[in-house]
Each structure stands twice: as structure tokens, then as C-alpha cells.
Amino acid sequence: MSFNRRTFLKRSAVTTTGLAALAGASGTAAAYDVPLISTRDHYNDDGSLVSGETQRSYDTNGLVPGIDTGCTGDLTVFIHGWDKNSSESGAEQAAREKIQHARDELTGAGYGGTVVGYTWDNDVGSGVDFGWGEAKTVAQKNGAKLAQVAVDYKSQCPESNVRFVSHSLGAQVLLSSLRSLNGSWFTDNGYDVYSTHLLGAAQDNEAPTQENPDTYDAITNVVTNAYNYHSNEDDVLQWIYNSFEFDQALGETGYEEGKTPAPNYDEFDATSQVGNDHSGYLTNLSDEIVSDM
């Protein structure tokens, strides 16, 4: 996929103000100091793109290095997961809190770079699967938008490292972005995502293996070091994948037994640290994650 950086950057300048105004309306602007990339309200409840947005458009809160401000030596983008319980405003606020938690945990564990949050429409859909199908669709569609972020950032800050960290369904945003970047301007110019870190990934467990060649090739070609942190007792992933996917999740079992993962892909069995706490990866593993950076 090719990316038109100039066309998008012109649009970004006018959307930043709108996101900042939204933050002010929610009462969190003064206290919230984490740089944010947002695609909130870019998708309808059925997962279709709203009028006025494109496959690669995104907004910021005016604090994102390389896009709104100067470059940083090391940039980590954190992508949150699914929200099946909250109202629209509640889902956005919960996402902001998770992003802030990620920033605090990673920096507290010694990460010296800048953590940026990526927030997306994780609360779309409804029905017997609680909107899981629509949320998956939107997560995968967000891959091109996150890829555009990486293109825009590296075009301005070519010497900086870029890393992606995801939780739960955020893994499908992350992996989709790698597929978008593979064979694009990004890799054609020799750029890479320096490391990726999947936490409790709500993603089929064959994804990083040769059984899924598009994702296998994307990990191999785009990423320097790819890590997956999983817990065999993660009961949220067990419920989702037993109920809706009839499969097993990468964040529960690790990659599918007997398959061949990408050569730059590694796993950490976090069962003893995380147990059945799907929300506990950052709290219990930040030291491990930072040591892998």
C-alpha cells in the first residue's frame, strides 16, 4: 500500500484543534498530558468508514512528536484493546486511562523514550457477540491509519526508533499496520519498526507463523524484534475465542504448536505473573517489556 504523506499532513493541521476541544469538553484536557493519536468516531457502528474520513486519516491532541512537535529519540505507540461494556464517552475515557497507565508503567520501569497513545473505535457494534465482529473489523481497518502514523513520523524523524505495544484486540491494529507497511514507502526506504510487543493478544494463534504468510512476511520484513507475552490462564481470551472464534488466542497459548513463527519473533510465557488477569499485563510485565526494548 502506498501513502500520500503531504495530502494527509495538510488535513492534520485542522483536525488537531477539534480533538483538543473534545478533550476540553470532557474535562480532562488540563490534566491529560499523554500525546494522543485518535481515530475515534471515524467508523460507524457497523464498522464502515464515516463520511469525511479516509482509510489513512487520523487526529492528534497536538502533542505527538514528529507530527505536532519536534522529534524524540525513541517513540513507543501504545494501542488499547476492546471495550464491550462502556458507553461511547465511557469507552473513550477508559481508553485514555489505559494509555496513561501504559505510559506510567513503562516509564516507571525505566523506558526513557516517549509513549504515545493510539485510541480507536473499540466500542462499535452490538448483538449476541457484544459487537466483537464489528470491533475486529474496525481494528483491522485501523492498521492503515497506524501505518500512516509511522510513515509520517519516520519521514520527519528518520533517525528515531519507533515501537508498537498493544493490548488485547489492539494486536489486530498492530499486525494490520505491519501488513500495510510491508512493501510500502516505509520499507522501500529502509525503515523499520524497531520492536513490537503484543500483550494478551486477541488474535488467532497462527498469525505470526507461516500458516498466515501475509502476517509472517510483515513481521519478518518490517520489524527488527517482535515479542509476544501470553498467559495460559487468561480467562477473557478463553471466553472470547471459545465463544466467538472457535479457535485459540495468541495471547493465551502463544503461537500454534507445530507451526513455524517468523525468525525475529520471540515469546514470553507470563502465566506465573499474569494468571487469569487480562488487564494485568502492563502492571506485572513492564520490567520484562522494557528489558526487551
What are these regions (language model features)?
Residues 1-16:
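N-terminal secretory signal peptides and thylakoid transit peptides that target proteins
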Residues 32-70, 81-158, 180-195, 201-293:
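Lipolytic serine-hydrolase domain surface
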Residues 77-83, 167:
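The conserved beta1-alpha1 loop
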Residues 166-170, 174:
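Gly/Ala-rich beta-loop-alpha elbow adjacent to hydrolase catalytic centers
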